[in-house]
From Swiss-Prot:
Gene3D superfamilies in UniProt: YehU-like (1.10.10.610)
Family of the protein in this entry: Belongs to the UPF0270 family.
Organism: Pseudomonas putida (strain ATCC 47054 / DSM 6125 / CFBP 8728 / NCIMB 11950 / KT2440)
A Pfam family annotated for this UniProt entry: UPF0270
Descriptive protein name: UPF0270 protein PP_1747
């Protein structure tokens, strides 16, 4: 299930994005400040280039690039 980013509380969205950008393997040696990485993800969400996917089975949220979202969820 896709969750519209603009329907999340601001603090919840920020924590979700911060969790994503600080996970092992997501920085690739990039020394970009946390605030900049968070802003980039917010912009990707606003432009429809990224989406929040909630998995009912695991009860977990994921941030995915548009090309990684199952096609049937985008229709």
């Amino acid at each position: 299930m896709l969750i519209p980013y603009d329907q999340l509380q601001a603090e919840t969205l920020t924590r979700l994005i911060e969790d994503f950008v600080t996970r092992d393997g997501t920085d690739n040696g990039d020394d970009t400040p946390l605030e900049t990485r968070v802003l980039r993800v917010r912009q990707a969400l606003a432009k429809g280039q990224a989406f929040i996917l909630f998995d009912l089975e695991s009860q977990q949220c994921q941030l995915l690039a548009k090309h990684d979202v199952p096609r049937e969820l985008l229709e």
